Amino acid sequence: MEIPGSLCKKVKLSNNAQNWGMQRATNVTYQAHHVSRNKRGQVVGTRGGFRGCTVWLTGLSGAGKTTVSMALEEYLVCHGIPCYTLDGDNIRQGLNKNLGFSPEDREENVRRIAEVAKLFADAGLVCITSFISPYTQDRNNARQIHEGASLPFFEVFVDAPLHVCEQRDVKGLYKKARAGEIKGFTGIDSEYEKPEAPELVLKTDSCDVNDCVQQVVELLQERDIVPVDASYEVKELYVPENKLHLAKTDAEALPALKINKVDMQWVQVLAEGWATPLNGFMREREYLQCLHFDCLLDGGVINLSVPIVLTATHEDKERLDGCTAFALVYEGRRVAILRNPEFFEHRKEERCARQWGTTCKNHPYIKMVLEQGDWLIGGDLQVLDRIYWNDGLDQYRLTPTELKQKFKDMNADAVFAFQLRNPVHNGHALLMQDTHKQLLERGYRRPVLLLHPLGGWTKDDDVPLMWRMKQHAAVLEEGILDPETTVVAIFPSPMMYAGPTEVQWHCRARMVAGANFYIVGRDPAGMPHPETGKDLYEPTHGAKVLTMAPGLITLEIVPFRVAAYNKKKKRMDYYDSEHHEDFEFISGTRMRKLAREGQKPPEGFMAPKAWTVLVEYYKSLEKA
């Protein structure tokens, strides 16, 4: 390639190189790639398919371009869509740092950005640009650069009135422009030419960031850039209101299969959308993907590590095989319809070995599996009515959709989830408080805690849900956790005690409900081996597995630091091995013993009112 002639001094570049005395290269030939876009699309991102395009955000300073672009980038990456944001301020610190704000420099600024965006799009990325780009001709040129390369280009006008932009004025630029300290400032003494026919207009003065992002995502879905299933919208399986009467009439006439309480809990999990994108109990293909890969693979890599299955006896199979649909009956009531059922063999030993890593018959959930029928039934589930347990706790059983709305109503910009099946002590609280503090330090303004106890089946020696909820309420009442930034809700899933395999399920379910961060601690979903008494799973593996698990890309894992009772400080504190003698590890066994005997724990271990609830629970056992 010919090197341009030397220049006597450094000059700013405009679109017309001749004006600056530059010699153009005349022996440049475009080199065609050996790799096609389709081939490149197969290896870029986690979903496959070429998605290269440019989303060109334009608008006044302060309109919200950077805010929307960064949020859109985060959303797409979290949903397996490769993308990158080119921000105006960032580009002017590097590639375009030799350009000013004259009309000529603005033109060259946009030209360079358009060329770079084209390369990103050609590489298979969704390239998001965030620039004022005030002139129609420059934006049209950017579009032509993409169209000349047969790449989609979407102009998005980020529209906010000038007075709103001035009120925001994060950088103080409007104030300086009004004072005459900045000349040629767009919107003040330099014109902004509004787009005449953009693909999308975002009214950022009336729509929040999430709404704006969803509008752009919908545009990309309409243009086949982003797959519809990439949005992970909650898939509820309740029959729509306008079809409910017909479905109930149908259910009464169908053959029936009786289900037990744990089955009913799984029906609730499916109905409320926790297992999105499942349409019902797993069919054989989904079951095999789950059992062997801990993921669903049709439509992208979606983490789903535990089989959600319905079992049947040989007699049930003989009676129902060949039916196009049958009703599920719980305690004499027809609660759902399973359509297009598929029967396949329930290989119990293989399932247990893969799901739990053991086939120990004394493991409480494995014991249930071994007692179940020899057949599994997959199918499309239609649930007739919302599921209530009438135990005084239904108000806490918020669905993923309801939780998302609640977080929105609270103006949460980050949601961190804490899953638990035990009472909360001050060590747990320390971790939650510290996570909240870290999120504030990272720039989040309104982090919200989802305190999300497991509400399905648990083994006999676990504290029952009703008592745990009383204990959690006492923790909030005493101010150990802030009620203003905490949502307490119940997760309806049964507990399987499957360690690192199950903790992926716990995590991804909270992801569906809108959590961005998930706190994981020592031995999550674990228990002592029923025969040896040792940990069934290595205590640190759950956290390690979560940080590596495929398909958990919309949230960040927050590993526990080990908390113990600091005898000197008389409070729960992060364990320091250099001062081991200052710390005491209070086991669950010792905690239960103290509560059972009505004794008080060490000062600062648990909120007093919360401890009183535990004492009352163990007293109730003695009376029983």
From Swiss-Prot:
Superkingdom per UniProt: Eukaryota
Pfam short name (any one): APS_kinase
Metabolic or biological pathway, per its Swiss-Prot or TrEMBL entry: Sulfur metabolism; sulfate assimilation
Region (Sulfate adenylyltransferase): 234-624
Tissue expr: Expressed in the neonatal brain and in cartilage.
Catalytic activity: sulfate + ATP + H(+) = adenosine 5'-phosphosulfate + diphosphate; adenosine 5'-phosphosulfate + ATP = 3'-phosphoadenylyl sulfate + ADP + H(+)
Keywords associated with the record: Acetylation, ATP-binding, Kinase, Multifunctional enzyme, Nucleotide-binding, Nucleotidyltransferase, Transferase
CDD domains documented for this protein: APSK, ATPS
Binding site for ATP 2: 419-422, 521-525, 563
Chain's role: Bifunctional enzyme with both ATP sulfurylase and APS kinase activity, which mediates two steps in the sulfate activation pathway. The first step is the transfer of a sulfate group to ATP to yield adenosine 5'-phosphosulfate (APS), and the second step is the transfer of a phosphate group from ATP to APS yielding 3'-phosphoadenylylsulfate (PAPS: activated sulfate donor used by sulfotransferase). In mammals, PAPS is the sole source of sulfate; APS appears to be only an intermediate in the sulfate-activation pathway.
HAMAP family in the record: Adenylyl_sulf_kinase (MF_00065)
Quaternary structure note: Homodimer.
Family per record: In the N-terminal section; belongs to the APS kinase family.
Protein name as it appears in the record: Bifunctional 3'-phosphoadenosine 5'-phosphosulfate synthase 1
Taxonomic source organism: Mus musculus
UniProt gene name: Papss1
